[in-house]
Protein backbone atom coordinates (compact mmCIF):
# COMPACT_ATOMS: atom_id res chain seq x y z
CA UNK A 1 0.00 0.00 0.00
CA UNK A 2 1.28 3.44 -0.84
CA UNK A 3 1.86 5.94 1.91
CA UNK A 4 -0.93 8.34 2.78
CA UNK A 5 -0.16 12.06 3.16
CA UNK A 6 -1.42 11.93 6.78
CA UNK A 7 0.74 8.96 7.86
CA UNK A 8 3.42 11.13 9.54
CA UNK A 9 0.74 12.95 11.56
CA UNK A 10 -1.02 9.73 12.55
CA UNK A 11 2.35 8.19 13.50
CA UNK A 12 3.07 11.25 15.68
CA UNK A 13 -0.24 10.79 17.53
CA UNK A 14 0.64 7.13 18.12
CA UNK A 15 4.09 8.17 19.43
CA UNK A 16 2.41 10.64 21.81
CA UNK A 17 -0.04 7.99 23.04
CA UNK A 18 -3.02 9.91 21.64
CA UNK A 19 -4.04 7.08 19.31
CA UNK A 20 -3.23 3.38 19.15
CA UNK A 21 -1.55 2.07 15.99
CA UNK A 22 -4.67 0.05 15.16
CA UNK A 23 -6.69 3.29 15.10
CA UNK A 24 -4.66 4.86 12.29
CA UNK A 25 -5.99 2.79 9.40
CA UNK A 26 -8.46 4.40 7.00
CA UNK A 27 -7.12 7.96 7.36
CA UNK A 28 -9.80 9.26 4.96
CA UNK A 29 -12.62 7.93 7.16
CA UNK A 30 -14.79 10.71 8.62
CA UNK A 31 -14.31 11.24 12.35
CA UNK A 32 -17.25 11.35 14.76
CA UNK A 33 -17.68 13.95 17.47
CA UNK A 34 -16.89 11.31 20.12
CA UNK A 35 -13.69 10.20 18.36
CA UNK A 36 -12.65 13.84 18.02
CA UNK A 37 -13.20 14.46 21.74
CA UNK A 38 -11.12 11.38 22.59
CA UNK A 39 -8.22 12.64 20.45
CA UNK A 40 -8.35 16.19 21.83
CA UNK A 41 -8.56 15.01 25.44
CA UNK A 42 -5.49 12.82 25.04
CA UNK A 43 -3.50 15.33 22.98
CA UNK A 44 -4.02 18.12 25.50
CA UNK A 45 -3.98 15.96 28.63
CA UNK A 46 -7.53 16.79 29.69
CA UNK A 47 -8.72 14.35 32.35
CA UNK A 48 -11.12 16.19 34.66
CA UNK A 49 -14.67 14.99 34.30
CA UNK A 50 -17.79 16.85 35.23
CA UNK A 51 -21.51 16.31 35.04
CA UNK A 52 -23.09 16.39 31.61
CA UNK A 53 -26.67 17.31 30.65
CA UNK A 54 -26.82 15.00 27.64
CA UNK A 55 -29.53 12.36 27.38
CA UNK A 56 -27.89 10.67 24.38
CA UNK A 57 -24.75 9.68 26.33
CA UNK A 58 -24.98 6.88 28.90
CA UNK A 59 -22.46 5.56 31.43
CA UNK A 60 -21.85 2.37 29.43
CA UNK A 61 -20.92 4.17 26.19
CA UNK A 62 -17.21 3.94 25.37
CA UNK A 63 -17.16 7.71 24.92
CA UNK A 64 -18.93 8.71 28.16
CA UNK A 65 -15.72 9.80 29.91
CA UNK A 66 -14.46 11.67 26.84
CA UNK A 67 -17.73 13.59 26.46
CA UNK A 68 -17.73 14.45 30.18
CA UNK A 69 -14.10 15.59 29.98
CA UNK A 70 -14.61 17.64 26.79
CA UNK A 71 -17.74 19.31 28.14
CA UNK A 72 -16.04 20.08 31.46
CA UNK A 73 -12.94 21.46 29.68
CA UNK A 74 -15.29 23.78 27.80
CA UNK A 75 -14.07 23.16 24.28
CA UNK A 76 -17.04 21.06 23.20
CA UNK A 77 -20.69 21.98 23.61
CA UNK A 78 -23.68 19.87 22.77
CA UNK A 79 -25.67 20.07 19.59
CA UNK A 80 -28.52 21.18 21.85
CA UNK A 81 -28.94 21.68 25.59
CA UNK A 82 -29.60 17.96 26.09
CA UNK A 83 -27.80 16.24 23.20
CA UNK A 84 -24.11 15.73 22.48
CA UNK A 85 -24.67 13.79 19.22
CA UNK A 86 -21.47 11.78 19.80
CA UNK A 87 -21.92 9.60 16.73
CA UNK A 88 -22.48 12.48 14.32
CA UNK A 89 -19.68 13.49 12.01
CA UNK A 90 -17.80 16.74 12.37
CA UNK A 91 -17.25 19.25 9.57
CA UNK A 92 -13.90 20.78 8.72
CA UNK A 93 -15.02 24.22 9.90
CA UNK A 94 -16.30 22.79 13.20
CA UNK A 95 -13.05 20.93 13.89
CA UNK A 96 -10.92 23.98 13.05
CA UNK A 97 -13.02 26.29 15.22
CA UNK A 98 -13.02 23.92 18.20
CA UNK A 99 -9.24 23.60 18.05
CA UNK A 100 -8.77 27.35 17.55
CA UNK A 101 -11.00 28.12 20.56
CA UNK A 102 -9.14 25.51 22.57
CA UNK A 103 -5.93 27.42 21.78
CA UNK A 104 -7.57 30.67 22.94
CA UNK A 105 -7.44 32.11 19.43
CA UNK A 106 -9.66 35.06 18.60
CA UNK A 107 -11.56 35.86 15.41
CA UNK A 108 -9.52 37.71 12.81
CA UNK A 109 -11.38 40.89 11.82
CA UNK A 110 -12.21 41.29 8.18
CA UNK A 111 -12.85 37.61 7.71
CA UNK A 112 -11.52 37.67 4.14
CA UNK A 113 -10.68 34.13 3.14
CA UNK A 114 -8.73 33.46 -0.05
CA UNK A 115 -10.43 30.14 -0.83
CA UNK A 116 -12.49 29.89 -4.01
CA UNK A 117 -15.37 28.51 -1.90
CA UNK A 118 -14.94 31.05 0.94
CA UNK A 119 -18.60 32.04 0.76
CA UNK A 120 -19.55 28.55 1.91
CA UNK A 121 -17.77 29.01 5.26
CA UNK A 122 -20.47 29.67 7.88
CA UNK A 123 -20.67 33.20 9.24
CA UNK A 124 -20.00 32.05 12.82
CA UNK A 125 -16.82 30.25 11.69
CA UNK A 126 -15.26 32.76 9.28
CA UNK A 127 -13.16 34.72 11.78
CA UNK A 128 -11.69 31.65 13.50
CA UNK A 129 -11.05 29.86 10.21
CA UNK A 130 -9.18 32.99 9.05
CA UNK A 131 -7.14 33.01 12.27
CA UNK A 132 -6.31 29.31 11.86
CA UNK A 133 -5.26 29.84 8.23
CA UNK A 134 -3.13 32.86 9.18
CA UNK A 135 -1.52 30.78 11.97
CA UNK A 136 -0.69 27.95 9.52
CA UNK A 137 -2.82 25.47 11.44
CA UNK A 138 -5.01 24.70 8.46
CA UNK A 139 -4.78 25.15 4.73
CA UNK A 140 -7.22 24.39 2.01
CA UNK A 141 -7.18 21.70 -0.61
CA UNK A 142 -4.76 21.88 -3.56
CA UNK A 143 -7.59 23.24 -5.74
CA UNK A 144 -7.83 26.33 -3.45
CA UNK A 145 -11.07 25.24 -1.77
CA UNK A 146 -11.59 24.85 1.96
CA UNK A 147 -14.54 22.44 2.03
CA UNK A 148 -16.05 23.94 5.18
CA UNK A 149 -18.98 21.52 5.26
CA UNK A 150 -17.02 18.42 4.25
CA UNK A 151 -16.64 15.75 6.91
CA UNK A 152 -13.31 16.06 8.66
CA UNK A 153 -11.27 12.89 8.29
CA UNK A 154 -9.10 11.05 10.76
CA UNK A 155 -6.00 12.11 8.81
CA UNK A 156 -7.07 15.76 8.71
CA UNK A 157 -7.68 15.77 12.47
CA UNK A 158 -4.25 14.21 13.04
CA UNK A 159 -2.62 16.98 10.98
CA UNK A 160 -4.58 19.70 12.79
CA UNK A 161 -3.74 18.34 16.23
CA UNK A 162 -0.03 17.93 15.48
CA UNK A 163 0.10 21.50 14.14
CA UNK A 164 -1.76 22.84 17.18
CA UNK A 165 0.14 20.90 19.85
CA UNK A 166 3.51 21.17 18.13
CA UNK A 167 6.42 18.85 18.62
CA UNK A 168 7.18 18.37 22.30
CA UNK A 169 10.77 18.47 23.50
CA UNK A 170 11.55 14.94 24.52
CA UNK A 171 15.31 15.05 24.80
CA UNK A 172 17.06 15.50 28.13
CA UNK A 173 19.06 18.60 28.86
CA UNK A 174 18.63 22.35 28.76
CA UNK A 175 16.76 23.91 25.87
CA UNK A 176 16.69 27.54 24.81
CA UNK A 177 13.51 28.56 23.06
Feature annotation, model-predicted:
Residues 1-7, 15-66, 72-93, 99-126, ...:
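Feature responds to low-complexity, polar/acidic, surface-exposed segments characteristic
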Residues 12-13, 70, 132:
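PEST-like intrinsically disordered low-complexity regions enriched in serine, proline, threonine
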Residues 129:
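Catalytic cores of secreted/periplasmic or lumenal enzymes
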Residues 153-160:
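C-terminal/domain-terminus segments
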Amino acid sequence: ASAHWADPYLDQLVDWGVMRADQTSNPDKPMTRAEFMAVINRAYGYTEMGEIPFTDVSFDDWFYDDVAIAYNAGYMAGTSETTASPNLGLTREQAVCILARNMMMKDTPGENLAFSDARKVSGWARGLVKTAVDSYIVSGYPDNTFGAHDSVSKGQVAALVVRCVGTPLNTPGEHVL
